[in-house]
């Protein structure tokens, strides 16, 4: 891979960080508004469709970006991906104006395709640095999610006020923000240096992720963490609402979760660089198990137990996500790296769809306690499997 100057590296990191922050801002606001639009127009039973569209789009986008990066370079791929996201946001905006389900979901799917490129940005950041600094580099890009987690919800009410002044539906406001944010992400990606060659890949190479060296461990752990995190997170608002708590309590608990997911990512990166990706992943799985035990012990303690549980849920996921990503950046051969990374992200995001659908069934069958128990088992299972494998 080509060598970057300090200025070129800083420019690349700034562009990658800005693109991820803006895409996350767009996704948070768009998904929230779309969920409310669908629930109001088609009933609560269909309100999960925007989330499914976003997850499927992101999985496909990550896979496609991983295939395209070796031959076309990071700048072209990210600009194109974010451009598709901007076009999708425009389509979704048209759907929001007319409360039409088809363009709304199609737009979210296209935004998800662009988000797939944003997900791979952490690996691109890691490639800019020597091995001993890759954990911190990719964690800084993961931290960009904090911007979206804060800015997306914060901009919803002001955006609604602006669009109602034009006589448009209030929920089209966050979608309008998504249009601007995705366009900004494409502009940010255009500032990436032109000549930052990626490790070459063999065009005919096909890699089975579970068999590639260094992939099985992070893949299993990242899928388990995603299943646990999404299942418990998705059902927590339902649990709170069923016990009479309002949106203010839901927002407080989810804020603790989002803080854990993103804000401490640089700390996770330092842990990965200091003690290694494997230790980081194992610690994350342990924290996830602790979070589910806390949720099980205090399922209605909205001022103490649940915020702590959801914070631990977010940070446990972050440790696994950063540690697993660092291991993929370190252990994969250059000729297969981006392709396998894209495939792994596609599998992980597909797990999100499974967790989102399955958690509702678990909650209906056994309540929040069953969701927490299954989440804890999912978190501990990789530790047991990988320990058994290491012992052989």
Positions of predicted regions on the chain:
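Intracellular juxtamembrane helix-capping segments at the cytosolic ends
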Residues: 34, 116-130, 319-332
């Amino acid at each position: 891979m080509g060598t970057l100057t300090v200025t070129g590296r800083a420019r690349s990191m700034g562009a990658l960080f800005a693109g991820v922050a803006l895409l996350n801002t767009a996704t948070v606001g768009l998904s929230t508004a779309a969920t409310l639009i669908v629930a109001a127009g088609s009933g609560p039973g269909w309100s999960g469709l925007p989330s499914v569209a976003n997850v499927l789009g992101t999985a496909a986008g990550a896979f496609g970006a991983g295939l395209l990066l070796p031959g076309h370079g990071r700048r072209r791929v990210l600009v194109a991906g974010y451009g598709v996201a901007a076009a999708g946001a425009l389509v979704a905006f048209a759907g929001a104006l007319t409360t039409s389900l088809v363009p709304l979901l199609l737009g979210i799917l296209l935004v998800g395709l662009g988000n797939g490129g944003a997900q791979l940005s952490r690996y691109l950041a890691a490639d800019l640095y020597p091995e001993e600094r890759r954990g911190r580099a990719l964690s800084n890009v993961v931290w960009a999610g904090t911007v979206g987690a804060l800015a997306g919800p914060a901009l919803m009410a002001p955006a609604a006020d602006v669009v109602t002044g034009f006589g448009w539906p209030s929920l089209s406001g966050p979608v309008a923000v998504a249009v601007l944010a995705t366009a900004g992400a494409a502009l940010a990606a255009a500032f990436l240096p032109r000549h930052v060659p990626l490790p070459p890949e063999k065009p005919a190479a096909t890699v089975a992720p579970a068999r590639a060296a260094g992939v099985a461990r992070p893949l299993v752990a990242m899928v388990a963490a995603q299943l646990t995190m999404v299942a418990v997170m998705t059902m927590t608002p339902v649990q709170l609402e069923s016990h009479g708590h309002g949106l203010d309590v839901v927002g407080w608990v989810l804020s603790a979760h989002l803080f854990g997911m993103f804000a401490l990512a640089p700390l996770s990166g330092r842990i990965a660089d200091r003690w290694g990706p494997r230790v980081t992943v194992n610690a994350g799985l342990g924290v996830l198990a602790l979070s589910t035990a806390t949720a099980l012990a205090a399922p209605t303690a909205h001022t103490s137990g649940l915020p702590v549980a959801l914070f631990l849920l977010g940070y446990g996921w972050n440790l696994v996500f950063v540690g697993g990503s660092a291991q993929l950046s370190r252990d994969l051969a250059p000729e297969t790296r981006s392709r396998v990374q894209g495939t792994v992200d596609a599998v992980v995001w597909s797990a999100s769809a499974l967790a989102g659908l399955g958690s509702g069934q678990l909650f209906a069958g056994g309540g929040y306690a069953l969701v927490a128990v299954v989440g804890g088992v999912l978190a501990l299972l990789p530790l047991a499997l990988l320990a058994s494998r290491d012992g052989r």
